Structures are given as C-alpha cells and as structure tokens.
A protein has these predicted regions:
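Conserved glycine-rich Rossmann-like NAD(P)H-binding loop of the short-chain dehydrogenase/reductase
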Residues: 31-43
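Catalytic loop of short-chain dehydrogenase/reductase
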Residues: 128-146
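Substrate-binding pocket helix/loop in short-chain dehydrogenase/reductase
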Residues: 91-92, 99-104
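Conserved NAD(P)H cofactor-binding loop of Rossmann-fold oxidoreductase domains
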Residues: 81-89
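Rossmann-fold cofactor-recognition segment
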Residues: 49-63
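A short, exposed helix-loop element centered on a Lys and neighboring polar residues
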Residues: 115-116
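N-terminal Rossmann NAD(P)H-binding glycine-rich loop of SDR-like oxidoreductase domains
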Residues: 15, 20-23
Length: 146
C-alpha cells in the first residue's frame, strides 16, 4: 500500500487577479492550496469555492506569518506564491517618504518574512517560491515613481 502525503501551495494575495487565477489553475491540476488574504469575506468565499483552507491576515501587520503557520499546523508545504502588491501612481514631486516605506514594507519586507517563516517546511518538502512583480517591468507607466 502506498501512502501519499498531501502537500499544499500557499498563496498570499489569493483574492487578487493573479492570486485567484493561480489558485484556480492549481486546483484544476490536482494541487491543494492554502489561501491567504486580508479580507475575511473575500478569502473565505474563494476558499469555499475551491474547497481550500485559508488564513485571513494583513501582511503589513507585525507577525502576520505566525497566523499562517498556526493555521497550517503540520501541513507539508511545497510551494509559496507571493501575489501581494499594489501600484501607487503619482508624480515624484508629490511622493512622500511614507509612500516609499509603505511600498517597501508591502513588496519586500512582508515577502521575506513569510519566506523565512515557511523556509524549513519548504526545504523539507523540496518546495519552491514564486514572487510576482509588477507589469511595470515590461511596460512603464507615467507617474510610476513609487
């Protein structure tokens, strides 16, 4: 008798366009996912639709990854997709230091925190990490100073 271990892919930003599309594709291909989003109604609705587990948390909050770890428990994780992000368009002359710090915290600090939190689980299960970036890499936008 073969014993199969069910592993999950964790998707942060699961209720956005990229995150929800990725979750649906993974489910269609037979994978299981753990969805992470900041809006309880949206993430629980998507989790119900996909028959998936989920965590509600905001990546800008201190120790947000502890909630994800708690909800996952001993679940083996073999993939992490960071689909969180925003696009804040304004001319450079109107930007403030706080705009850059907010973007830095959202796009870099929160990604490194969740990677560190899941690193042992991912390593043990030969997992991988995907960090989604912005469309602005391919095509610039006016007033994309942040």
């Amino acid at each position: 008798m073969m014993l199969f271990i069910v592993m999950k892919k964790v998707i942060l930003g699961a209720t956005g366009s990229i995150g929800s599309s990725l979750a649906k594709k993974l489910i269609e291909s037979g994978d299981q996912v753990h969805l992470v989003g900041r809006d309880e109604t949206s993430v629980s609705s998507l989790a119900n639709e996909l028959n998936s587990s989920y965590t509600t948390c905001d990546v800008l909050e201190e120790n947000f990854s502890d909630k994800i770890l708690s909800d996952l428990g001993d679940t083996p994780v073999n993939g992490l997709a960071f689909c969180v992000g925003s696009i804040d368009l304004k001319p450079l002359k109107l930007t403030k230091r706080s705009d850059f710090m907010q973007s830095f915290n959202l796009n870099l600090i929160s990604a490194t925190e969740v990677i560190k939190a899941l690193a042992d689980n991912l390593k043990k299960n030969k997992g991988s990490v995907v960090l989604f970036s912005t469309v602005a890499i391919k095509q610039g936008f006016p007033n994309h100073a942040i």
